[in-house]
Amino acid sequence: MSSPKTPQEITVLQLYPRDMNIYGDHGNLQVIIRRLEWYGYTPKVIHYNVGDTLPKNVDIVIGGGGQDSGQEKIHADLLKIGPKLHGWADEGIPMLMVCGLYQLFGHFFKTLNNTVLEGIGILDVETFGTNERLIGNIVTQSDKFGEIIGYENHSGQTFLGEKATPFATVIKGAGNNSKDGHEGAIYKNVIGTYLHGSILPKNPAVADFLIKTAAKRKYGSFSHDLIDDMFADMARHIAIERPR
């Protein structure tokens, strides 16, 4: 497998792993680390929790899901660092936000008890808490990534605004809500999604998008041999065949 001649560092920032990492989303970080290493890069991982100092420069940003209580814990801090995250998003830094952080990257999340958590507005989406839980295996189709699979488990229902582009279209499952057939949202290189499982182990094309985008932004190019994703493909096949 070809790789950069000299080790090149890629900095990966994980947002709020202490409070927003209860559905196995840490697996996304593990996939990015391993694939960076396979491609010959040196991953530098920074864990950011409430009250920490945000680094000046990053190459990839990821964040996971949590309970409503977890969102409330991080909310004020997220609003504080929101302008910096906005700037990074506008610059084209690749990001992956899952479930709870996907919701807070939108305009707001209105909980079932009518508490409104203001979002940072990177994604043109709005989320409303409901009594209906959307749970089960999900299969979607993306123009950019092909078939994307995962597991959804959320009671918040998210609706896209006019400026939002869906991450994928639902083939089996619910997606953002129980009405329109959209899953997730994209702004530039920022992806928001409800797919757990974790999403990246079974969808290496999405992981490689984050890595390739980061490498090209930082070093101007991305050249490598293909990784043998045989086991990921096997997992995908099994997951696709599972009932809802």
PLM features per residue range, with description:
Residues L112-E183:
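Pocket-forming structural segment of enzyme catalytic cores
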Residues Q67-K144:
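Cysteine-nucleophile active-site neighborhood
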Residues Q8-I10, D143-I148, I186-I191:
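Beta-strand-turn-beta hairpins that frame and shape the catalytic cleft
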Residues Y16-R18, S155-Q157, G197-I199:
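Glycine-rich beta-alpha junction loops
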Residues M1-G87, P201-R244:
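N-terminal beta1-alpha1 cap of cysteine-dependent amidohydrolase-like domains
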Residues I60-G64, L96, G192-Y194:
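Structural motif
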